[in-house]
Amino acid sequence: MAGYEYVSPEQLAGFDKYKYSAVDTNPLSLYVMHPFWNTIVKVFPTWLAPNLITFSGFLLVVFNFLLMAYFDPDFYASAPGHKHVPDWVWIVVGILNFVAYTLDGVDGKQARRTNSSTPLGELFDHGLDSWSCVYFVVTVYSIFGRGSTGVSVFVLYLLLWVVLFSFILSHWEKYNTGILFLPWGYDISQVTISFVYIVTAVVGVEAWYEPFLFNFLYRDLFTAMIIGCALCVTLPMSLLNFFRSYKNNTLKLNSVYEAMVPLFSPCLLFILSTAWILWSPSDILELHPRVFYFMVGTAFANSTCQLIVCQMSSTRCPTLNWLLVPLFLVVLVVNLGVASYVESILLYTLTTAFTLAHIHYGVRVVKQLSSHFQIYPFSLRKPNSDULGMEEKNIGL
């Protein structure tokens, strides 16, 4: 598996023909954030590789996730009667979240500024974004947590899926239309949540216990905003863009079945993970919510990355992500009845396997495309083909 090549020769040829096409109509992005990013990008030296900026932002998101996992492992820290997350942690998380969002906004501008734009850069950016979804949602959950003043772990599980499906819809659109319509919800959510983290440090988590309108709690507003944004903005706009392309006869695929193929694995992942929760003899989501969320988010990111590769290379998306086979077997075993400790071992084993498999997939795809385009992923220096090929062989990946 060390030298396994995930990107086929057909897909590599498709990447050679790829041209970036995106539409951003979000007023916040157009009139506030882009001017801000245009100023910020000038701070970066011209020798700094865009992918290094992208990866740095991703690492900040992961750091926030780990920091909050340390102070709030089971999502009870914001509940009454429990030891709360220190105020300085909220400030750090808020600042780092906004910095990560800023880095995600300037990486493409740095690529154009240094004349180093490649399909690898876009794939690297959007691939990491797909994994960031679970880190972002789970970290935000600590603001309210579970308990009498929060939301249940199952409700958060459903909200996580709302975010995941909202993310993949944009890439499903591009798979079918050839154009990436950037979602409005991303910019709004990043700016809002960064602000809310800081406010939490100032007013304390107790401020979120109180109703802000009649008996409508802030946790209800949190839930309503996520669902409302998905149902009233993301989904309608995705369907509108799809049907516009259908009406203009510009869809890349002629079959409804083929158009829906990219959504099969994510939907199956939702069905299997939900079945596990409902059939779990030990109530696995209550026992290990953070690990379960991470397992789902990692498997989802892997399916999304496969879609992005196919979308960018104009090749057919695989119907089934094979990571779902072991998940199916685990759900089958759980349904037959197992001891609580066995189910926990299965969850941790599966999560570890998914994580290693996804990291391997990402590393191999980046190395393949780096070799194909004759570039280094984290440097603007240009290697010759012999040196790059020898380097990859020596690394043994």
From Swiss-Prot:
Entry EC number(s): 2.7.8.1
Catalytic activity, as annotated: CDP-ethanolamine + a 1,2-diacyl-sn-glycerol = a 1,2-diacyl-sn-glycero-3-phosphoethanolamine + CMP + H(+); 1-O-alkyl-2-acyl-sn-glycerol + CDP-ethanolamine = a 1-O-alkyl-2-acyl-sn-glycero-3-phosphoethanolamine + CMP + H(+)
GO annotation, cellular component aspect: endoplasmic reticulum membrane; Golgi apparatus
Membrane topology: Multi-pass membrane protein
Compartments, as annotated in UniProt: Endoplasmic reticulum membrane
Enzyme class name: transferase
Expressed in which tissues: Widely expressed. Abundant in brain, placenta, liver and pancreas, followed by heart, skeletal muscle, lung and kidney. In brain it is strongly expressed in cerebellum, followed by the occipital pole and the frontal lobe.
This protein's UniProt keywords: Acetylation, Disease variant, Endoplasmic reticulum, Hereditary spastic paraplegia, Lipid biosynthesis, Lipid metabolism, Magnesium, Manganese, Membrane, Metal-binding, Neurodegeneration, Phospholipid biosynthesis, Phospholipid metabolism, Selenocysteine, Transferase, Transmembrane, Transmembrane helix
N-acetylalanine, modified sites: 2
PANTHER family reported for this sequence: ETHANOLAMINEPHOSPHOTRANSFERASE (PTHR10414), ETHANOLAMINEPHOSPHOTRANSFERASE 1 (PTHR10414:SF47)
Family to which the UniProt record says this protein belongs: Belongs to the CDP-alcohol phosphatidyltransferase class-I family.
Function: Ethanolaminephosphotransferase that catalyzes the transfer of phosphoethanolamine (PE) from CDP-ethanolamine to lipid acceptors, the final step in the synthesis of PE via the 'Kennedy' pathway. PE is the second most abundant phospholipid of membranes in mammals and is involved in various membrane-related cellular processes. The enzyme is critical for the synthesis of several PE species and also catalyzes the synthesis of plasmanyl-PE, a lipid required for proper myelination and neurodevelopment, from 1-alkyl-2-acylglycerol.
Annotated protein name in UniProt: Ethanolaminephosphotransferase 1
Source species: Homo sapiens (Human)
